[in-house]
């Protein structure tokens, strides 16, 4: 599979890192970003959160060079002018955060790409897939797809375990979310969300999120049953989902823990992880699981009403699932 990465920010760089780390058969042929290639090479090599990577990487002749591997840098703002046909691109990893609806993403197809994977919640009628939850519903005819959000990738596996074992009546989710690049280091104007413009490392900032509602896109049985909000907090990486849920059938917190533990070792292996350790957020920097269930952190009010907690590295964990989905698409499009 020949892919290009459109947008070489936090997620774009970590997708490439994970592809190289696992020696994936995926071939990255180009990166399109308006930032200069030598600076992007520097940002790829040195990461303040996840450490340095590919120390041998250099910028030469407009390419990111690592030994025999060369990845071409492009800096084209107009998607319809990109040379995807000439490069024989199978999939565009759309990680700018800008082309999230079908019409905008389809411009990559007009440029010659065969498929687009949006690394964000998509707007409109775009099939959304969460690994371990509904990825097997992928149809090769789906030429524009979404990998949902990092938060949905944490919540949906947990919701599926609850749905399959106990049923879900309704639930509210809060994600206590690490700061992201869209936030300001110090107070500044944010027209759409005034609070979002306040200093990221000085405040706990309430914010909106569609992550809980998006679970209904991959688990239709839960459409209209989940919603939620976010608190942006002053940490660089790792977030946590707090799910308050009313179940359909009576059970115990211990039974929920057993169901999650079983799933983590079977159907959700490599997607979910179960821990009873006294963990904190930094313990999961670099963790590749989508959802780490914290058995010590949850509580029960009665036999149908529970608060459940799951951690996730909102960068590496999510980037890993993007690579998983790319490889699944490759294997199931032949």
Curated annotation (Swiss-Prot):
Q: Superkingdom, according to UniProt?
A: Bacteria
- Any GO MF annotation of the entry: NADP binding
The UniProt entry's GO biological process terms, in alphabetical order, are:
glucose metabolic process; glycolytic process
List of catalytic residues: 150
**Which reaction is this enzyme known to catalyze?**
D-glyceraldehyde 3-phosphate + phosphate + NAD(+) = (2R)-3-phospho-glyceroyl phosphate + NADH + H(+)
* One Pfam assignment: Gp_dh_N
PROSITE patterns, sorted: GAPDH (PS00071)
User: What InterPro entries does this protein map onto?
Assistant: GlycerAld/Erythrose_P_DH, GlycerAld_3-P_DH_AS, GlycerAld_3-P_DH_cat, GlycerAld_3-P_DH_NAD(P)-bd, Glyceraldehyde-3-P_DH_1, NAD(P)-bd_dom_sf
Site note Activates thiol group during catalysis, residues? 177
The annotated pathway is:
Carbohydrate degradation; glycolysis; pyruvate from D-glyceraldehyde 3-phosphate: step 1/5
Gene3D superfamilies found in the cross-reference section: Dihydrodipicolinate Reductase, domain 2 (3.30.360.10), NAD(P)-binding Rossmann-like Domain (3.40.50.720)
Q: Its Enzyme Commission number?
A: 1.2.1.12
Q: Which GO terms describe its cellular component?
A: cytoplasm
Q: What class of enzyme is it?
A: oxidoreductase
**Keyword field:** Cytoplasm, Glycolysis, NAD, Nucleotide-binding, Oxidoreductase
Identify the residues that bind NAD(+).
10-11, 33, 77, 119, 314
Cytoplasm found in the keyword field: yes
Q: Where in the cell is it found?
A: Cytoplasm
Query: Which SUPFAM superfamilies does its entry note?
Result: Glyceraldehyde-3-phosphate dehydrogenase-like, C-terminal domain, NAD(P)-binding Rossmann-fold domains
> What is its biological role?
Catalyzes the oxidative phosphorylation of glyceraldehyde 3-phosphate (G3P) to 1,3-bisphosphoglycerate (BPG) using the cofactor NAD. The first reaction step involves the formation of a hemiacetal intermediate between G3P and a cysteine residue, and this hemiacetal intermediate is then oxidized to a thioester, with concomitant reduction of NAD to NADH. The reduced NADH is then exchanged with the second NAD, and the thioester is attacked by a nucleophilic inorganic phosphate to produce BPG.
Its subunit composition reads: Homotetramer.
Report the sequence similarity comment from the record: Belongs to the glyceraldehyde-3-phosphate dehydrogenase family.
Name of the protein in its database record: Glyceraldehyde-3-phosphate dehydrogenase
Q: Which organism is it from?
A: Chlamydia trachomatis serovar L2 (strain ATCC VR-902B / DSM 19102 / 434/Bu)
């Amino acid at each position: 599979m020949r892919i290009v990465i459109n947008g070489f920010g936090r997620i774009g760089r970590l997708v490439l890192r994970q592809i190289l780390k696992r020696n994936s058969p995926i071939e990255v042929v180009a990166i399109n970003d308006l930032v200069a290639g030598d600076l992007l090479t520097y940002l790829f090599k040195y990461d303040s959160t996840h450490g340095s990577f590919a120390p041998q990487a250099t910028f030469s002749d407009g390419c990111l060079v690592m030994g025999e591997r060369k990845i071409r840098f492009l800096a084209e703002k107009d998607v319809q002018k990109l040379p995807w046909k000439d490069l024989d691109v199978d999939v565009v990893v759309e990680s700018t955060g800008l082309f999230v609806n079908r019409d905008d993403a389809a411009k990559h197809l007009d440029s010659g790409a065969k498929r687009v994977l949006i690394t964000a919640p998509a707007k409109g009628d775009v099939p959304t897939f969460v690994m371990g939850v509904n990825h097997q519903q992928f149809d090769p005819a789906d030429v524009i797809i979404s990998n949902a959000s990092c938060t949905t990738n944490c919540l949906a596996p947990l919701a599926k375990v609850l749905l399959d074992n106990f049923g879900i009546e309704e639930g509210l989710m809060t994600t206590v979310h690490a700061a992201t690049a869209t936030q300001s280091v110090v107070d500044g104007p944010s027209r759409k969300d005034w609070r979002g413009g306040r200093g990221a490392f000085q405040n706990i900032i309430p914010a909106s999120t569609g992550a809980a509602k998006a679970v209904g896109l991959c688990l239709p049985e839960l459409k209209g049953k989940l919603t939620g909000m976010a608190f942006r907090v002053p940490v660089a990486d790792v977030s946590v989902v707090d799910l308050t849920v009313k179940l359909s059938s009576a059970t115990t917190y211990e039974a929920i823990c057993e169901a999650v533990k079983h799933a983590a070792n079977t159907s959700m292996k490599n997607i979910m992880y179960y821990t009873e350790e006294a963990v904190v957020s930094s313990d999961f920097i670099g963790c590749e699981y989508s959802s780490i269930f914290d058995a010590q952190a949850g509580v029960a009010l009665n036999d149908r009403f529970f608060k459940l907690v799951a951690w996730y590295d909102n960068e590496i964990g999510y980037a890993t699932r993007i690579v998983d989905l790319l490889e699944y698409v490759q294997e199931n499009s032949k």
